[in-house]
Amino acid sequence: MALTQERKREIIEQFKIHENDTGSPEVQVAILTEQINNLNEHLRIHKKDHHSRRGLLKMVGKRRNLLAYLRKKDVARYRELIEKLGLRR
């Protein structure tokens, strides 16, 4: 199921760095994590949906790259983000 505008707004409010922040790595990773979790639930039910599985792998790769960028730029922000999201890294 796609992310609703309301849910996306909630995520942005929770992870934004400053007012009007929609594109910081923290916000992008949080939105991707929510989408990945939703798609994981979908794939548990629909095991043969390989098209969506490929989309999931692309999202995971994009999130990995954003996390690597954030870790390189600011380790403190990176650690805070993975703790908030509950990612095991």
From Swiss-Prot:
Disulfide bond entries: none
SMART domains xref list: Ribosomal_S15 (SM01387)
GO biological process: translation
PROSITE patterns tied to this protein: RIBOSOMAL_S15
Pfam family, one: Ribosomal_S15
Cellular component annotations (GO), alphabetically ordered: cytosolic small ribosomal subunit
Superkingdom of the organism of origin: Bacteria
Keyword entries, A-Z: Ribonucleoprotein, Ribosomal protein, RNA-binding, rRNA-binding
Protein task: One of the primary rRNA binding proteins, it binds directly to 16S rRNA where it helps nucleate assembly of the platform of the 30S subunit by binding and bridging several RNA helices of the 16S rRNA.
Family, as annotated: Belongs to the universal ribosomal protein uS15 family.
UniProt cross-references to NCBIfam families, sorted A to Z: S15_bact
PANTHER family associated with the record: RIBOSOMAL PROTEIN S15, BACTERIAL AND ORGANELLAR, SMALL RIBOSOMAL SUBUNIT PROTEIN US15M
Subunit structure: Part of the 30S ribosomal subunit. Forms a bridge to the 50S subunit in the 70S ribosome, contacting the 23S rRNA.
Protein name: Small ribosomal subunit protein uS15
Organism classification: Bacteria, Bacillati, Bacillota, Bacilli, Bacillales
